Amino acid sequence: MAIEGGERTCGVHELICIRKVSPEAVGFLSAVGVFIILMLLLFLYINKKFCFENVGGFPDLGSEYSTRKNSQDKIYNSYMDKDEHGSSSESEDEALGKYHEALSRTHNSRLPLADSRQRNYAWETRQKYSPLSAEYDGYSSEASIDEGNCIQRMRRTPPLDELQPPPYQDDSGSPHLSCTPSEIGDSKCEFSHCSNSPRCSYNKCPSEGSTGHEIESFHNKGYEEDVPSDSTAVLSPEDMSAQGSSSQLPKPFDPEPEAKYGTLDVTFDYDSQEQKLLVTVTAVTDIPTYNRTGGNSWQVHLVLLPIKKQRAKTSIQRGPCPVFTETFKFNHVESEMIGNYAVRFRLYGVHRMKKEKIVGEKIFYLTKLNLQGKMSLPVILEPSYNHSGCDSQMSVSEMSCSESTSSCQSLEHGSVPEILIGLLYNATTGRLSAEVIKGSHFKNLAANRPPNTYVKLTLLNSMGQEMSKCKTSIRRGQPNPVYKETFVFQVALFQLSDVTLILSVYNKRSMKRKEMIGWISLGLNSSGEEELNHWTEMKESKGQQVCRWHALLES
């Protein structure tokens, strides 16, 4: 094909080459090429990174070899440097000979240390699973960096019985049990059957091939003695079990010579003219240990026997020697009948989420009381004994029944229903707290089975209008129920003498209407003299709870 009017002619392929490529195509092809190159570089980088990544959890097996290789190279270079700066007559073979000689000396100096560490690691790993070391775990050892290598060395080590020499025997023929601590800081206890006392050894483990005498240092409470021996005698657990009673192990603890249940520091002050008794509980000492009581909070309960209507309890204090310094008043204690009265003290261990536990108790008879002035004396508590019942005689010892078994009643009321109430008023906050503690001799008049009872509390003003009301939960099938529920009423100080608190005990029946077992009222319109005295004592107690038994009135 020819082009007319031109000086030269060209073929078809030359026409195609003459055409120009568009800049967009050039840019696109360049971008694709750059992208492919970047992806290739990224792939090579990632591949190289993964190849040199350490597998998690496995030690670097070549680190030790590389470190040793570097040290050898340094020694070799140092000798080569000396050879270059020294005389030129020394050949390279002689330098290599010096290098190998120095390397062998370095290896020989490090060999005993490595062997001792290897044996120590094997003994340490085996000792962790020994029953002998489990008995005396008072010594701790730190973990080594080469723990994985220690396990491998232990597998290649022959059993302990094959390594140990025959037991060393002294002049009396008694074998010695010794222990050897490793260089990483752990140590084991040893025992000497001839001295019957444990001794700890702090010496270095001898090598297997040692034939010389080793010096063992025995430390026993500051006393040091050097005893020469042929080798360290180590008894295996099988040898210990075979000896049986011949090996005397130390006791973990010495039992107390005499059990202690607590000692109260108490002060008595009796006023014969007003017929009242003031009892001050100062502190408690000689409290049992935590292992016996299981708690570290304490409370003292007091009750005047035999009537058991006047009760008191201290605040809760913590510590091994709690200090209370609280005074309680008991009224109507006639001087003519003082020989028939007694005060029972009980120390309780208080747990946050558990029931109170009696630690000890003591009944102090007022016949020992000094009727003139104060008398301070310690009251040593004794273990508590629960009595199943009591007679209706006017004997204090027979009326000192357990507080948990409320079947023991007072002489005045016989078997009438009674309720134990605790009152407390805080003048600062204006809060009246009424605690329903327990009931006694609740009866079901319609059936012979025990009743399902609850207590309803109602607070009335001076006009008889209801200010507040609340009730306890139901106690099912209990003639002597224990409630221990506290209710708080907001009463101003100037209104305290004008309010009435009514407590009603009901028997909850399923298909019938509820039945009232009895009731009492305290305050302005008190139901009796005892209830009025209880209210008056509550106002005079200055923030301390006053507990009293009250006989219920029939509806």
From Swiss-Prot:
GO cellular component: membrane
Gene3D superfamilies: C2 domain
Transmembrane segments: 25-47
Segments of this protein annotated with the region Disordered: 157-179, 222-257
Gene Ontology molecular functions: phospholipid binding
Cellular compartments annotated: Membrane
Cytoplasmic topology ranges: 48-555
Extracellular side of membrane: 1-24
Tissue: Highly expressed in fetal and adult brain tissue.
Residue ranges annotated for the C2 domain, each copy included: 260-379, 415-550
Keyword check for DNA damage: no
Assigned protein family: Belongs to the synaptotagmin family.
Quaternary state and interactors: Homodimer. Can also form heterodimers.
Summary of the function given for this chain in its UniProt record: May be involved in the trafficking and exocytosis of secretory vesicles in non-neuronal tissues. Is Ca(2+)-independent.
Annotated disorder: Spinocerebellar ataxia, autosomal recessive, 11: A form of spinocerebellar ataxia, a clinically and genetically heterogeneous group of cerebellar disorders. Patients show progressive incoordination of gait and often poor coordination of hands, speech and eye movements, due to degeneration of the cerebellum with variable involvement of the brainstem and spinal cord. SCAR11 is associated with psychomotor retardation.
Name of this protein: Synaptotagmin-14
